[in-house]
């Protein structure tokens, strides 16, 4: 059997590391990049010094400040991060022709047919990490395996500034031993549900018939059952034009408190706004999705007169969208935010200028 050779590269605390590189006084300090801790700001990235206090991305910035009062809070500089990301992706292009960017700081590379380093994906990953360090002054972690699932798990294993390899003969046993929460697509609510069923490690999924798993997991059952055996057929896909950008989350406890709903929406808004920035796009339409405790799902959308380009633009539209729902009177278990009508930022800015 011919195995694929997949490398997953993930920069270490990318935004925060760029800030520490550019300002030596920040090195060794707990740095938090994101929104203001004075309001509803959300953490976009945290240095490893800040992570030692339990601070992670998507957490409320106000909570992060309480956790670490001495933390240094910085606004994101997306233009700077994009420029460095382009430099890093240029390095990737020297090793692979099939590259799937996931974000500014993360990508999959399919090096199956490459003859670099006599076809050794491990040596290629070492060379990529070395060049990133030499050319940008930043560190990256890499995972090498025969599919995307295992390459991603491996790069997490190697963090920070490391390399981890999962060969084909070790793949099934390696993934089976992982906590169920490490699987892509298993969020906190799904993990809690599975753990109540006694499924705490990925391998525990194999004790269940696929039909029984389908009752609890729906269409995800087959994918997760394959994952438990180290199987992932997803190809590495070069970037294609996007039609929408979205994020949603199911929560372990339902709520009808509007203040809490706004708090739970904040990291989702930050996530989609960050993706919008990464792809240098603006949106014409914002859609809010709710699922009530009885599993009824609804969406509400708005298309403002001007372009939606950042988190503040989305936040300004949320109260009116929520007012069109029964949030506050009916308990909510899932929230989602999506952006559509995507256009390149410069093109939209030129059009908007011409109209005004």
UniProtKB/Swiss-Prot annotation:
Entry EC number(s): 2.7.7.7
Gene3D superfamilies xrefs: 3.30.70.270, 3.40.1170.60, 5' to 3' exonuclease, C-terminal subdomain, DNA polymerase, Y-family, little finger domain
CC annotations in GO: cytosol
Compartment list: Cytoplasm
GO molecular function: damaged DNA binding; DNA-directed DNA polymerase activity; magnesium ion binding
Residue span(s) of domain UmuC: 6-187
Gene Ontology biological process: DNA-templated DNA replication; error-prone translesion synthesis; SOS response
UniProt family annotation: Belongs to the DNA polymerase type-Y family.
Subunit structure: Monomer.
Protein name: DNA polymerase IV
Organism phylogeny: Bacteria, Pseudomonadati, Pseudomonadota, Gammaproteobacteria, Chromatiales
Gene: dinB
């Amino acid at each position: 059997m011919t195995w694929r050779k997949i490398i997953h590269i993930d920069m270490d605390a990318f935004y925060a590391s760029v800030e520490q590189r550019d300002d030596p006084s920040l090195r060794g300090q707990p740095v938090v990049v994101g929104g203001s801790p004075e309001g509803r700001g959300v953490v976009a990235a945290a240095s490893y010094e800040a992570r030692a206090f339990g601070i992670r991305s998507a957490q409320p910035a106000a909570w992060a400040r309480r956790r670490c009062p001495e933390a240094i809070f910085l606004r994101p500089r997306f233009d700077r991060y994009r420029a460095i990301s382009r430099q890093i992706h240029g390095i990737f292009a020297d090793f692979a022709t099939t590259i799937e960017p996931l974000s500014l700081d993360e990508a999959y590379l399919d090096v199956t047919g490459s003859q670099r380093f006599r076809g050794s994906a491990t040596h290629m990953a070492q060379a990529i990490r070395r060049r990133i360090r030499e050319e940008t002054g930043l560190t990256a972690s890499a995972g090498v395996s025969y599919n995307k699932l295992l390459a991603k798990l491996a790069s997490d294993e190697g963090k920070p500034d490391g390399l981890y390899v999962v060969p084909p003969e070790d793949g099934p046993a390696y993934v089976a031993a992982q906590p169920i929460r490490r699987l892509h697509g298993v969020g906190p609510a799904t993990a809690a549900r599975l753990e109540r069923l006694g499924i705490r490690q990925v391998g525990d999924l194999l004790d269940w018939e696929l039909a029984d798993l389908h009752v609890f997991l729906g269409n995800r059952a087959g994918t997760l059952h394959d994952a438990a055996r180290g199987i992932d057929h997803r190809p590495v896909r070069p970037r294609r034009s996007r039609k929408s950008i979205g994020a949603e989350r199911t929560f372990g406890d339902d709520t009808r408190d509007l203040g809490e709903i706004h708090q739970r929406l904040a990291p989702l808004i930050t996530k989609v706004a960050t993706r919008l920035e990464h792809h240098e796009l603006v949106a014409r339409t914002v859609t809010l999705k709710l699922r009530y405790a009885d599993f009824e799902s609804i969406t509400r959308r708005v298309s403002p007169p001007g372009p939606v380009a950042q988190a503040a633009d989305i936040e300004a539209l949320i109260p009116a969208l929520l007012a069109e729902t029964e949030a506050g009177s009916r308990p909510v278990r899932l929230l989602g935010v999506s952006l559509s009508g995507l256009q390149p930022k410069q093109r939209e800015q030129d059009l908007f200028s011409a109209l005004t």
